[in-house]
Amino acid sequence: MTELMKIAALFAVTALAEIVGCYLPWLVLKGGRPVWLLVPAALSLALFAWLLTLHPSAAGRTYAAYGGVYIAVALIWLRVVDGVALTRWDAAGAVLALGGMAVIALQPRA
């Protein structure tokens, strides 16, 4: 597995943890779902924060690179969970964001 694939996989798991941690409260507040869903939401957000610490880069650089993968995972969530068809604009935005992530994540180490 290449370094880029490892980084992208860790970012994808991190993004999923963040999305679940934010989606569950949304279900409680907007969808009238049970309040106990806030417990797994909090655990998911704690997992998200911990996963961010596994990256070797400085925190700001990690967050910047992570943003590209987050966009792609959020669009997959939009399609799979929300059932919304993606547009070519969604795809183009995801490609650009992932390209930015690769530039930031794979820069030469000083």
From Swiss-Prot:
InterPro entries: UPF0060 (IPR003844). Belongs to the UPF0060 family. It is a multi-pass membrane protein. This is UPF0060 membrane protein BamMC406_1172. The chain crosses the membrane at residues 9-29, 34-54, 66-86, 88-108. Keywords: Cell inner membrane, Cell membrane, Membrane, Transmembrane, Transmembrane helix. Pfam families: UPF0060. GO terms for cellular component: plasma membrane. It is found in: Cell inner membrane. SUPFAM superfamilies: Multidrug resistance efflux transporter EmrE. HAMAP family: UPF0060.
